[in-house]
UniProtKB/Swiss-Prot annotation:
A motif (Bipartite nuclear localization signal) lies at residues 35-51. It is linked to Systemic lupus erythematosus 16: A rare autosomal recessive form of systemic lupus erythematosus with childhood onset, characterized by high frequency of anti-neutrophil cytoplasmic antibodies and lupus nephritis. Systemic lupus erythematosus is a chronic, relapsing, inflammatory, and often febrile multisystemic disorder of connective tissue, characterized principally by involvement of the skin, joints, kidneys and serosal membranes. The lineage of its organism: Eukaryota, Metazoa, Chordata, Craniata, Vertebrata. Optimum pH is about 7.2. It comes from the Eukaryota. SUPFAM superfamilies: DNase I-like. Keywords: ADP-ribosylation, Apoptosis, Calcium, Disulfide bond, Endonuclease, Endoplasmic reticulum, Hydrolase, Necrosis, Nuclease, Nucleus, Secreted, Signal, Systemic lupus erythematosus. It is found in: Nucleus; Endoplasmic reticulum; Secreted. It comes from Homo sapiens (Human). SMART domains: DNaseIc. This is Deoxyribonuclease gamma.
């Protein structure tokens, strides 16, 4: 490569990365009224959301339905270049009186919601597997190499994680019967690590044993804030040749907001006990559409001292 071409190639790669769509998943622990009134925590949450073009927010505990409107006001205030967020939110889900919601916040200029539904968790002979049934959303975007994709979110109960993660294959089958969708993203707080999903349990999880499901966040990652823990609870899994080949190489990662925003562990825990996980989809305007296989990142993050 000539010296003249090298800077141009670097510039094109930089533009390509900037145009890519970042998709994130974030369990904001106990996201209710008290956290909503914590200005410092809310400022960090808004910063995290603004990094993402689509973000799944979990563990919303808001019987008054105020969290998302407040986030919209904060995100869309002084919006630059006409970039505004919208959202779609699930019903309040859970057994007995304990309820949570899933919400997807997204940049309206880049993506729109095609369809959505709540998975009906009452299959013959296998009723009520999920503590919080997936809220399935079909997104479309003219700006990404893959034009539409379904996101299936999940926040498991730790003690039943193995069964719930395995059951996502049934959700996949249900969506395929309903919609002509080919590209799938499964993501959320699967509690898929440490004692909740020991190594010997993986053989009982079809989402892992079927090689057509590609795991972007590996077992070696740490998605927890506490330096005393080291667990890959939060995951992203893909299904579909087109979407797998559209992932920006090495974009699948854990976002350490404590390090990024120079927070103490206590300040970070006021936000959540989980770090977000994320990846990028290539832009349709990219000068090349990489066909490299997605590989799991080697662990580079060390616990903060």
């Amino acid at each position: 490569m000539s010296r003249e071409l090298a800077p141009l190639l670097l510039l094109l790669l930089s533009i390509h990365s900037a145009l890519a769509m970042r998709i994130c998943s974030f369990n904001v622990r106990s996201f209710g009224e008290s956290k909503q009134e914590d200005k410092n925590a809310m400022d960090v949450i808004v910063k995290v959301i603004k990094r993402c073009d689509i973000i799944l927010v979990m563990e919303i505990k808001d019987s008054n339905n105020r969290i998302c409107p407040i986030l919209m006001e904060k995100l869309n205030r002084n919006s630059r270049r006409g970039i505004t967020y919208n959202y779609v939110i699930s019903s309040r889900l859970g057994r007995n009186t304990y309820k949570e919601q899933y919400a997807f916040l997204y940049k309206e200029k880049l993506v729109s919601v095609k369809r959505s539904y709540h998975y009906h968790d009452y299959q013959d002979g296998d009723a009520d597997v999920f503590s919080r049934e997936p809220f399935v959303v079909w997104f479309q975007s003219p700006h990404t190499a893959v034009k539409d994709f379904v996101i299936i979110p999940l926040h498991t109960t730790p003690e039943t994680s193995v069964k719930e993660i395995d059951e996502l294959v049934e959700v996949y089958t249900d969506v395929k019967h309903r919609w002509k969708a080919e590209n799938f993203i499964f993501m959320g707080d699967f509690n898929a690590g440490c004692s909740y999903v020991p190594k010997k349990a993986w053989k009982n999880i079809r989402l892992r044993t079927d090689p057509r499901f590609v795991w972007l966040i590996g077992d070696q990652e740490d998605t927890t804030v506490k330096k005393s823990t080291n667990c890959a609870y939060d995951r992203i899994v893909l299904r579909g040749q087109e979407i797998v080949s559209s992932v920006v190489p090495k974009s699948n990662s854990v976002f350490d907001f404590q390090k990024a925003y120079k927070l103490t562990e206590e300040e970070a825990l006021d936000v959540s006990d989980h770090f977000p996980v994320e990846f990028k989809l290539q832009s349709s305007r990219a000068f090349t559409n990489s066909k490299k296989s997605v590989t799991l990142r080697k662990k580079t993050k060390s616990k903060r001292s």
